[in-house]
Amino acid sequence: MNKCYAWVVRFALLCALSFVFLFPLWGQPSAPRATDRIVVTLSPQPLEGNQKVYFSISEGDQVSLESPSSGTLTLGEKKNRKQAVSLELPSGTTSFSLVGSLREFFIPYRAKGENTPKVAALDLQEAPRLLTLNCAGNDITSLDVSKNTSLTYLFCDANPIAELDLSRLPNLTSLSASDLKLKKLDLSANPKVAALGIGGNPFDQDFNLYAYSSLPLLQLTCDRLGLEEFDCSKFPKLEMLYIHGNKLKSMGDLRPLRSLLHLSIGDNPLRDFDENKLPHGRLRSLYCFGLGISSLDLSGFTYINKVDCSNNQLTHLSVNRCENLEVLRCGRNALTELDLTSLWLKELQCDRNQLSAILLSDRANMQKLSCYGNRLSLERMEQLVERLVKSSPEQSPRVFTPFTTRAEVPESNICPKSLVDKVRTAGWEVRVVTGVDAQGREITEDFEGSPMALEPTPQQSVFLYPNPAGEYILVENLSPNTWLCLYNASGECVQKELTGASGSLKLPLSHLPVGSYFLRADEGVFPFIIER
């Protein structure tokens, strides 16, 4: 009984003390939770109606639209620890503000097929807890990150930013600032930077890449800077080096870079490219495009996964012992045959060569194949299509590009519509290259909408020679006294001729540009090319 009484006394005393100390706080508002605020100014848009803006935050972050009040914020899918967010803003909106708990901000997080406005300015003064900022590909001219002292990752590529003050970011570990308007970049206050991208900036003549040699760099992107030399001993721990598009005349010996996994050295006027001086022990990807080399032997590169050796003068390419190779891009060379039967390829780009055969493994799980602008016969094309039909890739859609209608690219591949239908039935999308855009990227259209959908006659009773043709082409075994029509690759009839009583005809071609053509007669459709 005494013990019970003692506990009652203690409880009463505790309640009394709580009342004494907590009573002064009753009725007072609780301390506000820390809130981040980001103000976004949009570039002018010519579009009418409501505007849609997409961005992403970290999966655990919270965000709400502070203004304009008439806007709508919707949370989208979660992927790779990121939360997609979409905004619908009234027409004429020039800015909006977000509040919440924000550690990561990626804008614009563009949705496929959506025409979203770009960002003209970011006010980050009230977002001190921000750890990651990605604002690449916008119209930002000035970026103030002086209050974002916790920032560790900054990606601001492709903006017209002329100055970048990073002096208050001591924890910065990754900086991607390529294609800005920078004349100089001081990283003396950022000793932790391990990943650095500065390609395509108009740095002053006294720019010194080795000023960053004291940084613990693992990744370095310094492409298109006009560099005339590179001393790999200054950056011994590199795992990734992108140095393409410079003025390097000598590659030197890169074998000391024992940790190197990814190397891009293309589009340099190298005089001494030697694959034997590369650190082949661990290399996973190699980009050696546009070097003018005629031979490439990668037999010792056991772990390599991706190779881009396009736009060279290759007549010999050896990759058969690259057992981990999945992506091979060797277009715009002078190769006549590709034997890839030992590889488990997923993507092959071998367009604009002189290939008469492309041999793939039965085990290849092809997802993309571009082989236009070659000399594949009907028999070889049938073999190729059989391999594509049997492959069982992991992704869809699968894309097959066997043709081009570009006049400057001779097309001698023979792929009847029956073969196209066969590969389409197996789930492949068949494309035709029709041109290139201002950035040099290929423009394609669906096979069915192109003039290549004309059915070439696979077993020719009609003879055309020479093929490739030059100033003329001879056509034999035609029906007598019938009209022929000559089509260019765009599907336009550029010439009509009447056969004689013999069923033979000599067609003058000197007035026509080089490229791919089709001769249509009663007997069928016959492709040929003009070369000079």
Regions of interest found by a model, annotated:
Residues 107-118, 134-139, 150, 155-160, ...:
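Concave beta-strand-loop units of leucine-rich repeat
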Residues 69-139, 301:
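LRR N-terminal entry segment and analogous cap-like coil->beta motifs
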Residues 122, 143, 164, 185, ...:
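Canonical leucine-rich repeat
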Residues 44-59, 466-474:
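Short coil/turn motif common to extracellular beta-sandwich-like domains
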Residues 436-465:
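Residue-level detector of functionally pivotal "anchor" positions at catalytic/ligand-binding pockets or at interdomain
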Residues 57-61, 99-101, 127, 148, ...:
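Short proline/glycine-enriched turn/loop motifs at strand-loop junctions of beta-rich domains
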Residues 11-24:
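Bacterial N-terminal signal peptides
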Residues 457-465, 469-532:
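C-terminal outer-membrane/trafficking sorting elements
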